[in-house]
Amino acid sequence: MTDPLSTNISRLYRTIVSSPWRVAATLLGLAVIIALIALGVRAIALQNRSLALLNWLNLLLIPLLLIGAALWLTNSWRRTQIDVARLRDEREMVEGYFDRLTDLLLTRNLRQATSDDEAARAARAHTLTILRNLTSDGRGQIIRFLYESALLNAGEPIVDLQAADLSGVELSRVQMAGVNLRNVYLTGAQLADVEMSSSDLRETRLDGSNLSRANLSESYLRGASLKGATLSEANLRGAILTKALFLDANLRGADLADANLSGADLSRADLTGANLKGAKLNGANLTSAILDEADISLANINKANLSGVIAGGTNFSGANLAGAILVGAKLNGAVLGGAILSEADLSDAEMRDANLNLANLRGATMNQVILVGGNLRDAIMGRVALSGADLSGCDLSRANLSIANLSRAILNRANMEEAGLSGADLRAAQLRGANLRGAILRGAILGDADLSRADLTKANLRWANLNNANLTGADLTEVDLTDAEVSAQTLSKAKSVSKVDRPDTSHFESAPAVVVPTQSGPLPNPRTPSYQRPASGRTNALGNPAAEEKPVNKSDKP
């Protein structure tokens, strides 16, 4: 915002230099003021002889100040006259240009000409020549005249302005729908509230331009450069922005729904509250971009780079982020329900309270991710890498985590009811107080895991590895520990093992095939072990043979 004092001084200065008489009056006034100051100093000096030298210096200073003031005002007046003359010359050039183009329109039927016609070539040459000698206001007048004369149509313009320099042009609030400004230099242009829908702006330079609230819907901006441009609340719905450059651009509240941003560079761009619903962002670069509260639902962000992105509360529901890079991204409170994140890299991402309900995270890399309080219910997470991740208090009920790497993961108080963890690697994982009721942990590795106070009621731990696991206070009611590797000492620390089913493994013809959790690829179908009914005897709940009962022989009856 301009300082009011500076504005008043500038207005006073322009008023003075606009007339020689005002300049002379100002000089006279300054002379009087300086003379009064000198007389005051002289009076003081006469009373004190030690100030006599100062008195003489003041007397010498008076003419020097007057000469300097006169030179400054004269030079200012001369510059003002030059500016006035330049504006007058510019006005004459613009009027001459209008007359020349009007003549071509009326006598040479310029509107019906093609870009190769002599009249069109003459109009283009005349236009490019005059644009070099005009100010931003004059250039704006030329563009408006060409558009209103139907010479800048988006399809095939009669006057082609490619490579024309329109830097700083003033076109705010101008109606120019369907204009062709392809490959034009519009750096620093003032285009606020401009109407340019369905326009051709391919490879146009718009760096640092002001496009606030501009309407560019359905426009073609492939390869356009908008570095540092202001597009707050701009309408870019359905626009083609492939390989466009938006580095450091301001897109707060912009409407980019259904826009094509494939390969675009949005590094460090501010997209707070922007609408990107259904947009195409394949291979786009969004490094360190700000996406807080933005709507990116149903967007295609396949293989895009979102490293370090800030997207608090952003709506990614139904979006395709397959193969995307989100290393170090901050997605706290983000909504990713039903999103596709297969093979995505979310290492070191922060996703507190994020909603990933029904999300597809198959094969994703999420090492060291922070997902405290997240919702991963019914999520598909086969072969996901969550080593060292913090999932405290997460809802993973019915999630598919088969062959997932959860080593050293923190899952304290997590809800994993009926979750599929077959073949999962949970070595040294923290599962204190976790809910694993009905969870499938067949072939899972739980060595050194902390399952203290965990609820494993009706969980399936067939062929699981529980060596050195901490089961202190764990509820193992109706748990299936068939062929599980667990010591009696470990089980003795559990809260309840009264109904643990652990048949004698000697009755299996062969050990079941269990895939090692670190093995890549899908989990093959394990061989179903064949269980032979023993000829005699039975086992108790903890697998200790009971006393054999002799078969009753009818002939032995008395």
Regions found by a protein language model. Name each.
Residues 1-16:
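Cytosolic juxtamembrane N-terminal segments of multi-pass membrane proteins
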Residues 152-558:
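Tandem repeat scaffolds
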